[in-house]
Amino acid sequence: MASSSTLLNDDWKQGLAAPPKDLRPQTEDVTATQGSRFEDFGLRRELLMGIYTAGFERPSPIQEQAIPMALTGRDILARAKNGTGKTASFIIPTLNRINTSLSHIQALILVPTRELALQTSQVCKTLGAHIPNLQVMITTGGTTLRDDILRLQQPVHILVGTPGRILDLGSKGIASLNKCGVFVMDEADKLLSEDFMPVIEQTLALCPQERQVMLFSATFPWTVKEFKDQHMVQPYEINLMDELTLKGVTQYYAYVEESQKVHCLNTLFSKLQINQSIIFCNSTNRVELLAKKVTELGYSCFYSHAKMQQAHRNRVFHDFRNGMTRNLVCSDLLTRGIDIQAVNVVINFDFPRTAESYLHRIGRSGRFGHLGLAISLLTLEDRHNLYRIESELGTEIAPIPAVIDPVLYVAPAMVEEERESPPPKPAAIAAPPAQQQPQQRQRQHPPVPSHQAAQQSPAAAPVQQQQQQQQQQQQQQQQQQPQYQQAYGQGPPQPQALFQQQPNSSPAPAPLPSYSQQAPTQAQGPAPVQSPPPAPSTQPQAPAQTPIQGQIPPTQPRAQQQGQQQPGQPGQAQGQSQPNRRPNTGGFRGNGRGQGHRGRGRGRGGQPGQPGAGAGAGQSQQAQA
């Protein structure tokens, strides 16, 4: 192995295809280090190449403390905040220890969820991309054992999976763990709960006595101490939790009636500068229902929960990670370990029941020291949980203000562009496309020289007068427009000033407001130049292929859906299909006899009427073919 000085003198970094440098500011959660570099740890050259190719620049505090001790083979018990680099803290020393000339399993990494297993295995492959003949295998529940059996017949160096499947493979002799020298548990607090503890102990018994055990998590309950006393040998303890919540995540709450949560969610989408967002619900049924509502508002949206097929869950996670959509509705399935740095907004549509769940939810934003925003929609029944979670986490969740400053959750460069650009006019008073075209052409053409501008000045005066007249007319129309309460009574309750305006929507007293045909555009980056009304969805979406459960393509608003909805595919919004009817040409009368129901019979295709389908008076009517 080359020494640190040799690595520093060589120009091996110049040929690496590193990604563009991330210029976003970072908080002290990842910058408060002692100035160490990855070269100072004595890592192998191939591993260093993978680290810098992946975009790593300097180790974070947890990496700076955990990697050197893990390289010595000592047991590690590390506690650090979400999104501060815990995954690389155990993968880097594990990869440095792997001997690819041996064909047996040398490291076992256990995680609580399938999505986290998929992400962890991908990180292993990315960081070890330059290590020759490195073999990483992932195995989780929801897949057939046959594929795992065939894969384990080949050399496997690192095995990543969920506890149940790992124990199944090990107890049946399919996966040999008797030479596995590294035993890692990510999200150890979850793995050492009552549900997983028996499985973990049985799996650990399959490993040799001379092993290295490493535990990483953001929270450590009392069960972790019991496991440490029984199965770990003088572990090196790391605790970087001066506070539980991330410093870069701003937390707000808003009291909202249950029937108006979707209405408030639409307002947040219209006002916030969302790069990507994750919306959490407390049950799988509410996940699918909310995903359908978000789609009806005109926003592209995927959903994921534990009852979906594993292939569909993997596809949704992969597409959301690659930016195929901006919004993901999910349950607590994705609260642990999921690292998507493009997510800057987390919305608790249902307030979590425990402080642990709340901590992991808001940790999906503000990853690796970046800025993030967490907003919780509360009902009156949730106020007790709010006080309890604040006291347990030692944090303060503030009421949502009238205006949320983008500086709190958006990169400064994007905020400056937003402020330099003129704000867009509301959709209700926006100028027609014909009036916007001259302004667009004026922005597209280069500046006119001064001598030509003098010649064009007489013609420019009428244009300016015309624009002033248009602005005055728009202001008059806005003043004459009926107010919300005058037209619809008291309307839905608006607990905070943020929800007073209804951008790009037509208010209605129903629990779910009916929205205009022009779907609201989710704010992103600098304000766009005025243009004709956009399509119902401006967000990226997956290509039209075989429907995947959990992926809901954007639909038209309700005003455009009458008579056009088709029966939904699995995982898509189930629309009420309308039968194709031709004019009545004197078909046969229905017999009015339903199976167990009495209703009006309807003939189909000119044939004798079928049994009545509705609960009616039992009298047949003129059939419609």
Curated annotation (Swiss-Prot):
Function, as annotated: ATP-dependent RNA helicase involved in mRNA turnover, and more specifically in mRNA decapping. Is involved in G1/S DNA-damage checkpoint recovery, probably through the regulation of the translational status of a subset of mRNAs. May also have a role in translation and mRNA nuclear export.
PANTHER family listed in its UniProt record: DEAD-BOX ATP-DEPENDENT RNA HELICASE 50
Top-level class of the enzyme under EC nomenclature: hydrolase
Keyword Transport: yes
Protein name: ATP-dependent RNA helicase DHH1
Domain Helicase C-terminal: 248-408
GO (cellular component) term, any one: P-body
Localisation per UniProt entry: Cytoplasm, P-body
Biased composition (Low complexity): 427-441, 450-505, 513-528, 538-586
UniProt remark on domains: The Q motif is unique to and characteristic of the DEAD box family of RNA helicases and controls ATP binding and hydrolysis.
